[in-house]
Each structure stands twice: as structure tokens, then as C-alpha cells.
């Protein structure tokens, strides 16, 4: 059997942080997909996992050294506070140290009921498991901090939702699964001792440089805010819409987590919403930075009494820290957008240049991903302008912007060929297009055909490369193929 070198620090925290629970065995598990490179990174034997991984990753066989538990947390869901949520269908097996010396969680999602399941069955359907595998690995390839997919395993038994669906278990790897909602769980109970214990644990695990800070808990809030600002800026750079930015889905580590109703934009529209449960657009594409700050304010509320013994001083420190978030986000976002349009230097007019392009894209219903990818070709040769402009409903509307952009490029130091290569390195050709994800899920769920799943994984693992044989995967959906709504899948 594969050896996992577990060292389970979270399981050594007080008992009110989690519930110990064993996975519920399933009927006939089989391994759909193993992420062999990630297994190697975690110090696991991929060959052995191909043989006996189905038993481990389904929950039928708990590996030696694992201490399975479900984590307690609360959270604001669409702005409404729920004092107890917790892992209702996810079980943390334990922690391993990877090849880079980083501590990583290994969690089974869909492994059975826990004390936090409420009325749920603790199971996952195949479709959401495949979606999370595809999108989390695509995000990693795009360079966006994210939890990872180690394995997808079929359970051999059905789950009952609006219809009967094949069941599966997703094996997730994360820097940790500690969320803003983890702090809220203890704050809701007035348990400041546990908040301090959790904060000390987080500092030791994720932010050890803060241990010697004069105000370590305030520094923790600032550090989490900085990571979230950088993360959400990266989401916007690749057209990603999380869909369910509840406080229980915001990690303290700064990784993207929980891909239930997530999606990528096709035509650029800042108001884009895909999630079926986001009826009022709270988590729309352009709202994500502000929601990030709102969530961080909820984190600050749990920590504020640790900032200073004088209440007014503590509140002022918290507000100042939260105020820095917007500045940090704007810098990350604008720096990234500069790179997307080929700029290395900073000029005051750059924000207007970026915003005017986005306005043209919105008015012209231009594809977000393809616009920036084709702009790289135009940076090298103006003959590519026609193909770029064809993405817009009124192609000629782009011409004045291109003239303005080229005048700005004249003040840049890079040769055109280097600039185009740099732009291609930040503007993907391939993303997990929503219609392609749905096609892959449908083939697997309805026909047990995983070929589209495998093909999509392959293409999106190299998002910045031109892949001439896979041009169809770069294309927007045809009429009738558009995905207008996504679902949580729980």
C-alpha cells in the first residue's frame, strides 16, 4: 500500500475545532483520474496509487497515519450569517509535507456524512467532481493560486439529487482548508481563546514571518488581505467568476477554493453572473473585489479585540488595514492589465487605456480571452488587426483605440517580437470554456465516456501555448452552445 508521510498538526488542535469521523465505504470504487505529477510532488508513489488508489481515494481504505476529521466553520452565505456549517461531505485525511517543504492538506470530498452534514447525504455527484478537477487544474496552469486535484474516483453507487446521478469522490490538496468562516465559528460562540489559538496556528503555518511582529494579529489581517487582493486581481485577469464568494469559501492561505458554480466569461461584461443561486448578482465578475473586502471585514470583526486593548484604537487599526486592501488590489489589477496589453512601464494614462479597451469590448460583445490573445499578434504585426477587430460587433470601432495603444507602445523599451511573446505568456489561448466543461461532464455522466474530460485537461494544462491541433478548444461557443447558468452541484 502507498505510504503517506502524515503529520497532522490540525488534529492536534483542541477538540472543538473539528469532529473525528471515518469515511463511509462505497460499493465498487474505481479510479477515474490520478494527478501523477502532483502525487510525485507530495512524495507519493504514483505507480502504487494507480493500483490501490481507488480504495484510498474513495474512503474505503484509510491509509496508515491518517487522522480523518471534519472541520468546523461558520459563514456568511450571500450576506446571511449561518453560525454552524462545517465539512458536511468532506473529510480531511491529514497533512503531508511536499517536495518544497510546504505542508499540504489531503481531503476527500464526497466521502460520506459527518456531524456537520445537516440534512445532506455527504456524497458528491460525478459532474461536480469532474468540474472541480478540470477548473482547479486549469487555474493552476494559468498561474492562479488554487487548491489542487489529486484524484477523481467513481464510487460505483448513485447519488440522489433532482435526478439519479453517478457518485464520485474528489481528492483535494490545499495549503490548508482554514477559512474566514473558521474564525467566525468561534466568534459566534464568544470563544476568544479559540480565536487566539487559531490565529497563532495560522501564523505558524502560513505566515511564520509574523511571529515577531509587534502586533501579530493585525499583521495577520493585513497579510490575508494582501493575498486575497492579489488572488482576486488574478481572477479578473483570466475572466474567472467564482460564483459563491461566501466567507466559508475564502481561504486564509490565499488559494481559490470551492468551484461549484464557477465559470469563465466568454463575451466581456462586468455584470456577468453564472451561478443559479446568485439571483441578484452579488458575486458578479466586477463585484468580486468589493466582496473580497467585505469578507475581510468579517475576518477583522473576529480578530479586532486582539489588535489593541483599547477598543477604539483596535477598531481604527482594523479599518486602516481594510483600507489598504483597495490600494493593493488596484495595483495588482492594473499591473496585470498593463502586462496583458504589452506595457512594462507605468504611465498615468494607462488606466484610461485599459478601461477604454474594456468598454469597447463590452459594447462590442467581444470575447474576453480571445481579444487579449489576438492583441499579442497585433503587437507584433498590424496586419493582425483585422482578425482582432472581427471579434467586435462593429470592427471599425476598435481602430482609434489601436492607434492610441500603438503611440503608447512607442514609449516602451521592448522590441515588438519580445513584447508579443511576453503578452502571449500572460494572455491564455485556452481556458476551460464553460460549454466544453459541460460537454465533458455530460459525456462522462451519461455515457461513461471520459475522453472529452481527458482532452480538456490536456489542452488546459498548457494554456499559454499555441496548440494548432486544438484550435476548437480556443473558440467561443457556437449559437446554442452557450452556458448561461451554472449550478452548485451539492
Swiss-Prot record:
Keywords: ATP-binding, Magnesium, Manganese, Metal-binding, Nucleotide-binding, Nucleotidyltransferase, Transferase. It is an enzyme of class 2 (transferase). GO terms for molecular function: AMPylase activity; ATP binding; magnesium ion binding. Its EC number is 2.7.7.-, 2.7.7.108. InterPro entries: SelO (IPR003846). It catalyses: L-seryl-[protein] + ATP = 3-O-(5'-adenylyl)-L-seryl-[protein] + diphosphate; L-threonyl-[protein] + ATP = 3-O-(5'-adenylyl)-L-threonyl-[protein] + diphosphate; L-tyrosyl-[protein] + ATP = O-(5'-adenylyl)-L-tyrosyl-[protein] + diphosphate; L-histidyl-[protein] + UTP = N(tele)-(5'-uridylyl)-L-histidyl-[protein] + diphosphate. The keyword Nucleotidyltransferase applies. PANTHER family: PROTEIN ADENYLYLTRANSFERASE SELO, MITOCHONDRIAL (PTHR32057:SF14). Nucleotidyltransferase involved in the post-translational modification of proteins. It can catalyze the addition of adenosine monophosphate (AMP) or uridine monophosphate (UMP) to a protein, resulting in modifications known as AMPylation and UMPylation. HAMAP family: YdiU_SelO. Belongs to the SELO family. This is Protein nucleotidyltransferase YdiU.
Amino acid at each position: 500500500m502507498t505510504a503517506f508521510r502524515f503529520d497532522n498538526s490540525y488534529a492536534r488542535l483542541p477538540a472543538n475545532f473539528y469532529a473525528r469521523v471515518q469515511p463511509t465505504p462505497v460499493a465498487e470504487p474505481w479510479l477515474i483520474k490520478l494527478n501523477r505529477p502532483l502525487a510525485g510532488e507530495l512524495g507519493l508513489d504514483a505507480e502504487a496509487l494507480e493500483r490501490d488508489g481507488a480504495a484510498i481515494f474513495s474512503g474505503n481504505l484509510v491509509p496508515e497515519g491518517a487522522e480523518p476529521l471534519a472541520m468546523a466553520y461558520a459563514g456568511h452565505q450571500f450576506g446571511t450569517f449561518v453560525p454552524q456549517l462545517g465539512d458536511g461531505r468532506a473529510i480531511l485525511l491529514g497533512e503531508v509535507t511536499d517536495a518544497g517543504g510546504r505542508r499540504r492538506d489531503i481531503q476527500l470530498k464526497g466521502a460520506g456524512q459527518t456531524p456537520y452534514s445537516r440534512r445532506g447525504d455527504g456524497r458528491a455527484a460525478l459532474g461536480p467532481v469532474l468540474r472541480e478537477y478540470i477548473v482547479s487544474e486549469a487555474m493552476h496552469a494559468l498561474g492562479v493560486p488554487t487548491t489542487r486535484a489529486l484524484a477523481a474516483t467513481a464510487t460505483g453507487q448513485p447519488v440522489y439529487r433532482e435526478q439519479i446521478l453517478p457518485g464520485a469522490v474528489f481528492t483535494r490538496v490545499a495549503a490548508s482548508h482554514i477559512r474566514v468562516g473558521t474564525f467566525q465559528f468561534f466568534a459566534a460562540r464568544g470563544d476568544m481563546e479559540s480565536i487566539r489559538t487559531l490565529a497563532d496556528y495560522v501564523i505558524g503555518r502560513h505566515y511564520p514571518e509574523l511571529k515577531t511582529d509587534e502586533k501579530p494579529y493585525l499583521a495577520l489581517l493585513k497579510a490575508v488581505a494582501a493575498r486575497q487582493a492579489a488572488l482576486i486581481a488574478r481572477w479578473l485577469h483570466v475572466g474567472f467568476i467564482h460564483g459563491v464568494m461566501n466567507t466559508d469559501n475564502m481561504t486564509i492561505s490565499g488559494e481559490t477554493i470551492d468551484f461549484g458554480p464557477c465559470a469563465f466569461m466568454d463575451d466581456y461584461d462586468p455584470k456577468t453572473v453564472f451561478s443559479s443561486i446568485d439571483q441578484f448578482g452579488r458575486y458578479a465578475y466586477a463585484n468580486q473585489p468589493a466582496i473580497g473586502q467585505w469578507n475581510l471585514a468579517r475576518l477583522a470583526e473576529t480578530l479586532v479585540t486582539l489588535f489593541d486593548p483599547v477598543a477604539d484604537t483596535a477598531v481604527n487599526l482594523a479599518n486602516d488595514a481594510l483600507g489598504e486592501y483597495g490600494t493593493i488590489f488596484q495595483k495588482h489589477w492594473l499591473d496585470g492589465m498593463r502586462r496583458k496589453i504589452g506595457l512594462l512601464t507605468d504611465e498615468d494614462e494607462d488606466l484610461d487605456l485599459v478601461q477604454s479597451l474594456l468598454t469597447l469590448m463590452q459594447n462590442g460583445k467581444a470575447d474576453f480571452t480571445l481579444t487579449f490573445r489576438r492583441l499579442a499578434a497585433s503587437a507584433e504585426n498590424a496586419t493582425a488587426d483585422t482578425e482582432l477587430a472581427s471579434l467586435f460587433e462593429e470592427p471599425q470601432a476598435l481602430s482609434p483605440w489601436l492607434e492610441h495603444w500603438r503611440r503608447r507602445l512607442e514609449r516602451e523599451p521592448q522590441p515588438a517580437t519580445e513584447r508579443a511573446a511576453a503578452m502571449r505568456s500572460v494572455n491564455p489561448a485556452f481556458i476551460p470554456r464553460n460549454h466544453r466543461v459541460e460537454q465533458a461532464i455530460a459525456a462522462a455522466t451519461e455515457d461513461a465516456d471520459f475522453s472529452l474530460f481527458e482532452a480538456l485537461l490536456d489542452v488546459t494544462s498548457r494554456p499559454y501555448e499555441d496548440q494548432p491541433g486544438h484550435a476548437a478548444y480556443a473558440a467561443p461557443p457556437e449559437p446554442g452552445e452557450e452556458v448561461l447558468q451554472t449550478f452548485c452541484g451539492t
